[in-house]
Amino acid sequence: MGPRNPSPDPLSESESEEEENTNYLNESSGEEWDSSEEEDPVVPNLTPLESLAWQVKCLLKYSTTWKPLNPNSWLYHAKLLDASTPVHILREIGLRLSHCSHCVPKLEPIPEWPPLASCGVPPFQKPLISPSRLSRDHATLNGALQFATKQLSRTLSRATPHAFLPKLVPLAFSS
């Protein structure tokens, strides 16, 4: 019998196993395997759409933008002219989302949406294909964008022109 090697330290044994696993992974994940090749070309990346749908879900609470303001006051219109108003943000999200439209299931036409303040979040729209989280989120997104665009257009069409706003704004608010 040859000289006996003392049993290796359990910690160093696990470290060497980790190194072997890492080496194996590095070797197997070389140029031969590319994760982008494994993605199904028919199914596009829906992460941007899901992210935008989540942003819109958060913004759907924006009925408070309309409730506390009197529609006849200058402040109501000034608030809508502010680019940080959720309506503008929703429209911006809609523009960014337009490049994803090819990857979204086709939906039935969107009916006239009632004001969010009176009914809360609009109901989900029935998709033409089997229900999925994506199609429900996108239906809600479509409705929110349609409502936001319509509300913004209607309000801005009644808004006081910029030239008259300084006369209406109290001195405390003017810069």
Swiss-Prot record:
One of its GO terms (biological process) is protein ubiquitination. Pathway: Protein modification; protein ubiquitination. Residues 12-21, 29-41 have a biased composition (Acidic residues). Pfam families: DCA16. It is found in: Nucleus. Disulfide bonds: none annotated. The keyword Glycoprotein does not apply. Residues 1-42 are annotated as: Disordered. Keywords: Acetylation, Nucleus, Ubl conjugation pathway. The modification N6-acetyllysine is found at residue 61. It comes from the Eukaryota. GO terms for cellular component: Cul4-RING E3 ubiquitin ligase complex; nucleus. Functions as a substrate recognition component for CUL4-DDB1 E3 ubiquitin-protein ligase complex, which mediates ubiquitination and proteasome-dependent degradation of nuclear proteins. Interacts with DDB1 and CUL4A. PANTHER family: DDB1- AND CUL4-ASSOCIATED FACTOR 16 (PTHR16194:SF0). This is DDB1- and CUL4-associated factor 16. The lineage of its organism: Eukaryota, Metazoa, Chordata, Craniata, Vertebrata. The gene is DCAF16.
